[in-house]
């Protein structure tokens, strides 16, 4: 938010964290940059944020399941705010949770940082578009604003699912059967997505 404030792209910002350390560093960075319109709130998720004080919520740097939990505890954000979400892991759990939160994906962007691929989702209240098993992992092609990395995310999630499927197959536990079947369906769907994306199945 400091860069956005300095560039005049936002008027004010609220930074939250459940730990004092990151908030203290945020205050120090804001002071060093000469930024005054950044409020730092020690709280869990959005619990310490006034619903009337923000119109855009950014949640980044954590797993998709944790982002979903934060939104579930802040229904006002789901109703009224534009939410920019960047899951560090388990994006499929976040995408799967959005319909129950009354949120629809407006757009997605893929970015690569330090060799890793990340999805950034812009979501807002609305009727969600149905996603296939594979799209829960990779995103829907028609929603991705820049498709240059879409082939890479398909390959990455395909490999991730292959490793997970092999692990569950080796375990042979009956309790893993439902999970294994779900992963197989997602893997098959991603394989089909790759064929459609490349056009020739390569």
Predicted region positions:
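Conserved SAM-binding loop of SAM-dependent methyltransferases across substrates and taxa
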Residues: 1-10
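Active-site segment flanking the S-adenosylmethionine/decSAM binding pocket
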Residues: 48-74
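Short loop/edge segments at beta-strand edges and connector loops
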Residues: 42-44, 87, 107
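An accessory alpha-helical subdomain
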Residues: 133-202
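Conserved beta-strand signature within the Rossmann-like core of class I S-adenosyl-L-methionine
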Residues: 78-94
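S-adenosyl-L-methionine
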Residues: 8, 14-55
């Amino acid at each position: 938010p400091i860069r956005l404030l300095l560039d005049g792209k936002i008027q004010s910002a609220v930074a939250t964290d459940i730990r004092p350390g990151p908030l203290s560093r945020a205050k120090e960075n804001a002071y060093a940059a000469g930024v005054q319109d950044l409020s730092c709130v020690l709280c869990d998720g959005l619990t310490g944020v006034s619903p009337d004080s923000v119109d855009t919520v950014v949640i980044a740097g954590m797993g998709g399941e944790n982002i979903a939990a934060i939104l579930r505890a802040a229904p006002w954000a789901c109703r009224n705010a534009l939410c920019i979400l960047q899951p560090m892991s388990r994006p499929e759990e976040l995408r799967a949770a959005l319909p129950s939160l009354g949120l629809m994906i407006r757009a997605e962007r893929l970015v690569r940082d330090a060799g890793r691929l990340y999805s950034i989702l812009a979501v807002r209240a609305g009727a969600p578009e149905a996603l296939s098993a594979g799209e829960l992992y990779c995103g829907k092609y028609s929603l991705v604003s820049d498709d240059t990395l879409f082939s890479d995310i398909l390959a990455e999630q395909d490999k991730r699912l292959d490793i997970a499927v092999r692990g569950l197959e080796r375990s042979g536990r009956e309790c893993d059967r439902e999970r294994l079947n779900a992963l197989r369906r997602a893997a098959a769907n991603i394989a089909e997505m790759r064929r459609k994306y490349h056009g020739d199945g390569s």
